[in-house]
Amino acid sequence: TDRRRREADDLGLKPEDVVTVASIAEEESAKPDERGKIGRLYINRLHDGMRLQADPTVKFAIGDFSIRRITVAMTQCKSPYNTYRNQGLPPIRLPEKKTIDDILTSEPHNYMYMCAKEDFSGYHNFAATYEQHRAFAKKYQDALNKRGIK
């Protein structure tokens, strides 16, 4: 719609870029109320010139969406869809319109990192700094180890 095009332009994105960000955000979180924040985090990374480093793109590149734990080795797989290795936005899947709208209207924030919560609720901890992120990641890795998730 015209509204979505204007909102995408306000974010410095093409409409198709918003669709791609939305598709990654949907795969990243099963919690619809979190997807706008996740999408905005990826937009922050794009604007900062960072790689997205989005776990769903690794699952897509490997061809296995049942993976529960992304390893460092997995992030090195050679694929144009792997955003740990490649800059920019790859296609993943067609997102819901609501996710697109949630991203376009999400509150601006300074988050650059996220990690699944260690309580396995499906929600994420968000961080503005890499140091904060590492602390959250350690909690999550410890919880995975405690449950024997490889």
Where are these regions (language model features)?
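Bacterial extracytoplasmic/cell-wall-associated proteins, especially those involved in peptidoglycan
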Residues: 1-150
